[in-house]
Design a protein with these regions (language model features):
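SAM-dependent nucleic-acid methyltransferase catalytic core
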Residues: 2-24, 28, 74-201
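Short active-site oxyanion
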Residues: 31-34, 54-56, 164-167, 219-225
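Short His-Asn-centered micro-motif
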Residues: 37-38, 60-61, 170-172, 188-190, ...
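Short, solvent-exposed loop/turn segments at secondary-structure junctions
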Residues: 41-44, 63-65, 129-132, 174-177, ...
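Short loop/helix-cap segments at secondary-structure boundaries that form the rim of catalytic
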Residues: 51, 178-182, 234-241
């Protein structure tokens, strides 16, 4: 399952960064549990699960439509697969795919629609047919509907179900996963401190995220933690006493306005509260 990196397109996703991050993840092999409070596209958790199958894995995301997708992928993958195959076969052209995209967006935005399978189908459809991979914040992309909303991608979903079958998946606030257990490794990929609001309904999960409180929360616990952030002196100053590493990271998405233009020149910052040896500097 080497080709199984993430079933989703997600802004800030780490599918291309896992190999560069591996040297900072060496501590994981000594642990019994892996936790990820901001699951997003899940590429790091999938990478860890495949590389360290002995670990108990607890993943979480506060964004409910995303959480719901992962739960359905885990618990009802056959129905998800069959429904998406049927929809793709009936909407093969961009014109009909756009109609499906708009209906899916309307369905997902109506909070009275609580059928978990249909909401997961709608989320996946929007994710694959949009410019950015976002839901409420996205617009339809003809190119994405053809290249990303594909039978090939849908056919890979059962493979992801096998990988995540033993995950504990929750929809709670990140701090509930923090702990003092030194045999629990925690990887945190919070909303970045940037100008654009990418996550949640109308960007609420970016706009409303308290970065100062997040730093204080992480600093209170002694379990090994690795945090991904946008590199800035302000971020580093919040994590006094933590070790840092940086590497270049170019994302594949180019369609979220000024945010993505800025990404071409930025560094990925890693903060960690444990010792490492033999680190290699990546460019």
């Amino acid at each position: 399952m080497k080709s199984h990196k993430t079933p989703l397109r997600y802004p800030g996703g780490k599918s291309r960064a896992c190999t560069k991050m591996d040297q900072y993840l060496l501590k994981v092999s000594d642990c019994k549990e892996y936790r990820e409070p901001f699951l997003g596209g899940g590429s790091v958790a999938i990478h860890i699960t495949k590389k360290y199958p002995h670990l108990d894995v607890w993943v979480n995301d506060l964004y409910e439509p995303l959480y719901n997708f992962w739960r359905v992928l885990q618990d009802d993958s056959n129905a998800l697969y069959e429904t998406l195959c049927d929809l793709k076969s009936r909407h093969p052209e961009p014109e009909s795919a756009k109609e499906l995209f708009l209906k899916s967006k309307e369905y997902l935005n109506d909070e009275s629609n609580n059928d978990s399978l249909q909401r997961a189908v709608s989320f996946y459809t929007i994710n694959k047919c949009s410019f950015s991979g976002l839901t409420e914040s996205s617009s339809f992309s003809k190119q994405a509907s053809d290249s990303n909303f594909s039978m090939r991608g849908i056919e890979k979903l059962p493979g992801y179900t096998k990988i995540i079958k033993n995950w504990k998946i929750t929809n709670i606030s990140y701090e509930e996963l923090l702990c003092d257990n030194k045999s629990t490794f925690i990887y945190l990929d919070p909303p970045y401190e940037i100008g654009s609001n990418l996550y949640g309904k109308r960007g609420s999960m970016h706009k409303g995220f308290d970065h100062d409180q997040f730093a204080n929360d992480c600093d209170r616990f002694v379990s090994p933690q690795l945090i991904s952030y946008n590199s800035s002196q302000l971020v580093k100053d919040r994590f006094k006493g933590w070790q840092t590493g940086e590497f270049d990271l170019t994302y594949t998405m180019r369609s979220v306005g000024e945010y993505m233009r800025e990404q071409k020149e930025r560094k990925e910052l890693l903060l960690f509260n444990y010792g490492t040896q033999g680190l290699v500097e990546f460019n």
